[in-house]
């Protein structure tokens, strides 16, 4: 059923091993390099150029055809444009989740299927599905389930939590059952040691080697305003723009006996409210308001309409038990009650929901609920 597989080749070790394993399995493998960003930073550096050269090197070595797919315009509209608008509104977005939803598992998936004749696509993500790493357990009558990768540290289901079930049904994750260390050893064993040695890219792809503060300042107008102590109402410093700061971040304010941390941003007044101390109780809440959920496999609720599941809003943080309750008739708005309070719940980020090893999907965070101190009062 699945003969031709188009691999998203990035120039890194994960997609290199993915392509090699698919070829060893006898698939008709085609490579596709996604060009999503084409600007060079002020130092003249563009990591995408080297990645493209490495992708060509891999496909020559494996003797598979390679095509460059250009999604630069779409990326600007669907990902980067939304990214800037969110920062201008005072919220903190997650461009990696948006890229997977709109580009890799939407436009790229459709391109591979319609233009390259793919029966399925494959990527080097650390994730799994119930259909198996090579879709060997595919069942057109069964629902697709997104499962965590076996490498707890590298698991990428958090970033895949907004993709469509239709695309996921025809996606292979060959390295999802491997750890990063195993992938690198495998690469070295099969003659792909150059890719195993390549430094792993970290952070937001379009920022490159620049500091995020310098980068974002190129696109959003600097508008200075006040840092205000939320407890006292006093101005304690000046900021250079709301977009430079996110909830929970340490505020750089000189001359203070105790460090301040960002609590809230008032866009209309261009004010950042801060609180004293990283463990200030106002930064902690056990309630979260979310909207517009995307369900990969919509879970069943309990008889009282409550879903018991696991929650995280940062992919490196431990999962927390929670109760999920719909707060609108159409299910577009929900309320999350956490079993234990968390610090710095950030508007614009995503609440991702799990049960055991399955990732159900996610919803965008609108705002945190009141702090535990307020509720206790």
Predicted regions and their residues:
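ATP-dependent adenylation/nucleotidyltransferase module used to activate substrates
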Residues: 1-161, 172, 181, 188, ...
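AMP-forming adenylation/ATP pyrophosphatase catalytic core
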Residues: 122-128, 134-377
């Amino acid at each position: 059923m699945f003969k031709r597989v188009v691999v998203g080749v990035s120039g890194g070790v994960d997609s290199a091993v993915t392509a090699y394993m698919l070829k060893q399995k006898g698939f008709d493998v085609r490579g596709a390099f996604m060009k999503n960003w084409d600007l060079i930073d002020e130092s003249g550096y563009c990591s995408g150029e080297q990645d493209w050269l490495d992708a060509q090197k891999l496909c020559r070595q494996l003797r598979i055809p390679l095509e460059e797919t250009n999604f630069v315009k779409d990326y600007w509209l669907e990902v980067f444009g939304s990214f800037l608008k969110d920062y201008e509104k005072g919220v903190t977005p997650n461009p990696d989740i948006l890229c997977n939803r709109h580009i890799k598992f939407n436009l790229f998936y459709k391109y591979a299927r319609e233009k390259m004749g793919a029966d399925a696509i494959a990527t080097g993500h650390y994730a799994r599905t119930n259909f198996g790493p090579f879709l060997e357990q595919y069942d057109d009558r069964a629902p697709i389930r997104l499962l965590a990768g076996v490498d707890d540290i590298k698991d990428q289901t958090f970033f895949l939590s907004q993709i469509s079930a239709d695309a996921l049904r025809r996606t292979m994750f060959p390295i999802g059952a491997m750890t990063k260390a195993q992938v690198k050893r495998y690469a070295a064993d099969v003659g792909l040691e150059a890719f195993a040695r390549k430094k792993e890219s970290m952070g937001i792809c379009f920022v490159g080697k620049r500091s995020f503060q310098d980068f974002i300042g190129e696109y959003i107008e600097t508008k200075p305003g006040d840092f205000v102590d939320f407890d006292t109402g006093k101005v304690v410093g000046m900021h250079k723009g709301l977009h430079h700061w996110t909830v929970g971040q340490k505020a750089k304010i000189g001359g203070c006996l105790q460090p301040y941390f960002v609590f809230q941003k008032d866009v209309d007044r261009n004010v950042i409210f801060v609180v004293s101390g990283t463990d200030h109780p106002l930064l902690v809440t056990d309630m979260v308001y979310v909207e517009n959920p995307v369900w990969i496999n919509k879970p069943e609720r309990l008889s009282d309409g409550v879903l018991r599941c696991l929650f995280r809003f940062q992919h490196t943080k431990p999962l927390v038990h929670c109760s999920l309750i719909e707060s609108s008739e159409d299910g577009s708005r929900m309320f999350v009650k956490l079993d234990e309070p968390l610090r710095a719940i950030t508007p614009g980020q995503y609440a991702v929901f799990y049960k055991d090893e399955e990732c159900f999907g996610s919803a965008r965070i609108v705002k945190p609920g009141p702090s535990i101190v307020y509720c206790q009062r």
